[in-house]
Every structure is written in C-alpha cells, then in structure tokens.
C-alpha cells in the first residue's frame, strides 16, 4: 500500500489550511456517495488525500463549499 503524506499533497495545495479544508470537504462528499476520481478501496479521507496528491482535486473544492 502506498502511503500518502502531507508533503505529497502540499505540492498541489501549498497552504496547509486550505489543504485541510479541501480534504475535509472532499472526504465528506465521498462519504455521502459521490463518485471517487481514482480507484481505491480506502476510507473517504484517504481517497480525498490521494485525489489531491494526484492532482484530480485542488483548491477549486473550496469554491464549491456552500456558505
């Protein structure tokens, strides 16, 4: 199993706070049944981080958050 580190994700989203918000929002989407953008059997939080590290999901996640 490949490990996901914060450093891998920081290459895509340099701000740690924005990274945490984007990962949280995407993990919630996945937990609610949205289709993952990568193939994985991991939990939603890990899938969200993998999507960010691979570049499939980025800061644009934060623009979709309802206020």
From Swiss-Prot:
Keyword Transcription: yes
Assigned GO CC terms: DNA-directed RNA polymerase complex
Keyword Ion transport part of the UniProt annotation: no
Example GO molecular function: DNA-directed RNA polymerase activity
Catalytic activity: RNA(n) + a ribonucleoside 5'-triphosphate = RNA(n+1) + diphosphate
Keywords in alphabetical order: DNA-directed RNA polymerase, Nucleotidyltransferase, Transcription, Transferase
SMART domains found in the cross-reference section: RNA_pol_Rpb6
Domain of life: Bacteria
GO biological process: DNA-templated transcription
Annotated transmembrane regions: none
EC number in record: 2.7.7.6
PANTHER family hit by this protein: DNA-DIRECTED RNA POLYMERASE SUBUNIT OMEGA
Functional description taken from the UniProt entry: Promotes RNA polymerase assembly. Latches the N- and C-terminal regions of the beta' subunit thereby facilitating its interaction with the beta and alpha subunits.
UniProt similarity note: Belongs to the RNA polymerase subunit omega family.
Subunit structure comment from the entry: The RNAP catalytic core consists of 2 alpha, 1 beta, 1 beta' and 1 omega subunit. When a sigma factor is associated with the core the holoenzyme is formed, which can initiate transcription.
Stored HAMAP family: RNApol_bact_RpoZ
Protein name: DNA-directed RNA polymerase subunit omega
